[in-house]
Amino acid sequence: MKLLYFFVVITVLVAVAAALPAKTEEQIAAEENQLVEDLVQYAGTRLTRKRATRCSKKLGEKCNYHCECCGATVACSTVYVGGKETNFCSDKTSNNGALNTVGQGLNVVSNGLSAFQCWG
């Protein structure tokens, strides 16, 4: 009985695979060229984006990097509002006082490490 089910499943999979349209070499080459163009465009915009070199944002302001936020314990935090990512400068990591203190200590370490990201 299991062999019969196995045979039916294989038959259906083969039928579905045979029904799918095959791509021609021209279509594959066109998709490859489009991907290469997209990659070149992305790399170009990525390399020309200016990065922050020192703090310029206060608590609550939007940010992209930790080094943009002024303050030893202030970091660029990410929150999701309505499924959309939002970054802002924040020094609060938890509603629990002890965990918040630990989080601020981690923010200090994170700010130190992000200094390398902000050079240039």
From Swiss-Prot:
Disulfide bond listed as a keyword: yes
The keyword Signal belongs to this UniProt entry's keyword annotation: yes
GO MF terms held by the record: ion channel regulator activity; toxin activity
Main location: secreted
Positions of the pro-segment in this chain: 20-51
Tissue: Expressed by the venom gland.
GO cellular component terms given for this protein: extracellular region
PTM section of the record: Contains 4 disulfide bonds.
Signal sequence coordinates: 1-19
Subcellular localization: Secreted
Listed transmembrane segments: none
Keywords for this protein: Cleavage on pair of basic residues, Disulfide bond, Ion channel impairing toxin, Knottin, Secreted, Signal, Toxin
Biological role stated in the UniProt entry: Weak insecticidal toxin with probable ion channel impairing activity. In vivo, induces paralysis when injected into sheep blowflies (L.cuprina). Shows weak toxicity, since it is only toxic at high doses, and flies recover within 24 hours.
Domain notes: The presence of a 'disulfide through disulfide knot' structurally defines this protein as a knottin.
Family to which this protein belongs: Belongs to the neurotoxin 25 family. F7 subfamily.
Protein's name in the database: U3-hexatoxin-Hi1a
Organism per entry: Hadronyche infensa (Fraser island funnel-web spider)
